[in-house]
């Protein structure tokens, strides 16, 4: 994989991880032990590996069957997801969050990683390198979740909704790039 291929994946991983960062930032304002912070971040990272992997496998299948239509659909999916993230971030704003434990942690991790399924679907259609992609998504999301939890425990409302909006805008940009390559 070339650096030219790796850089967009890293940027996309940061865009996806901004959702986990923003939510973790708010959650970090709840008193958490370091072990809880580590566990929450690792769970989010694992889900950011599993969800895009499933999406990429499905995306490759669709690409082999439907070719150009699948490419167009993948780009539209990224654009739609990006707009949805921006819209829902503005509409919902900040909400009170509590630290997830047990099953609620898995539901939480699933919720913040569902967008990575859609991105994985798009990347599968375009034939992105699976192992590198999912490991980048997982690692960066885990690190951003840890950062959000730690920063949230020290300061309030650093990024909040704006972090999610930036992530959504980046996804729209990548969708447009896939539709209209430079």
Swiss-Prot record:
| Keyword match Lipid biosynthesis | no
Q: Which domain of life is it from?
A: Bacteria
* Membrane topology of the entry: Multi-pass membrane protein
**Could you tell me where this protein is found in the cell?**
Cell membrane
Q: Which residues cross the membrane?
A: 6-26, 37-57, 72-92, 101-121, 131-151, 162-182
Q: Which family does it belong to?
A: Belongs to the MntP (TC 9.B.29) family.
Q: What is this protein called?
A: Putative manganese efflux pump MntP
Q: Which organism was this protein described from?
A: Bacillus mycoides (strain KBAB4) (Bacillus weihenstephanensis)
């Amino acid at each position: 994989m070339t650096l030219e291929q790796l850089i967009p994946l890293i940027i996309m991983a940061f865009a996806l991880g901004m959702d986990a960062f923003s939510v973790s930032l708010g959650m970090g304002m709840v008193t958490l032990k370091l072990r809880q912070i580590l566990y929450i971040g690792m769970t989010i990272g694992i889900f950011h590996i599993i969800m895009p992997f499933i999406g990429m496998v499905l995306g490759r299948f669709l690409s082999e069957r439907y070719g150009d239509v699948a490419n167009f659909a993948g780009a539209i999916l990224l654009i739609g997801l990006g707009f949805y993230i921006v819209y829902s971030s503005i509409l919902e704003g900040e909400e009170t969050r509590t630290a997830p434990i047990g099953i609620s942690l898995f539901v939480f991790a699933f919720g913040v990683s569902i967008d990575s399924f859609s991105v994985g679907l798009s990347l599968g259609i375009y034939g992105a390198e699976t192992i590198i992609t999912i490991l980048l998504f997982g690692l960066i999301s885990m690190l951003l979740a840890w950062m959000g939890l730690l920063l949230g425990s020290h300061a309030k409302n650093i990024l909040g909704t704006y972090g999610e909006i930036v992530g959504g805008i980046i996804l729209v940009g990548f969708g447009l790039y896939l539709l209209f390559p430079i």
